[in-house]
Amino acid sequence: MLGMKLVRLIEKHSEALSRELMEQVLNSEHASDFQKIPQEDLRLAATDLYRNLEEWLLQKREDDIAERFKAVAARRVQEGIRPHHMMWALMLTRDCLWRYLRKEAFLDSIVELHAELELQQLLNQFFDRAIYYAIQGYEEAEEQRRRRTDWTRAQELAVSIGLLSPPRAHHETAEETS
């Protein structure tokens, strides 16, 4: 693939790219929830994505992308990151790549232009799927949270009307259990 030269350029400079991305995310009012997360965690997540970009674009299947971004979304829910902030951060991740490539890649021929367009298509496809599955992950995490809340309310109601006994304390003595 012609665009692999550009992908390798991104992977080679993954540390610098991740620092730039982290600064953009932390300074964006549209992604301000990410200020709740340790900066080192954000930097490592971005570096991992950029460093393994070729694998994500060429070797990973759609199921792999779904699994990864649903898990990321579930983790972000636990961290208090709202969905629209996560989506903005993903868009910043993609945009950071393109700014870098425009700055660093010197297109000397129509072949290199074709390679960049080919890479752009792959990246857009990847990030579209990442956003889709991240949203799905948020929805699944919210549904699980809602079910746990509903179950807790149902148990409390059953106890209050005498259908269930109140839960026992976890620290029972030997006399109480015999």
What are these regions (language model features)?
Residues 2-84:
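N-terminal low-complexity or simple alpha-helical regulatory segments
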Residues 1-2, 177:
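Short, low-complexity, intrinsically disordered N-terminal peptides in bacterial proteins
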Residues 6, 65-172, 176:
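Long, amphipathic alpha-helical coupling/dimerization segments that relay conformational signals between
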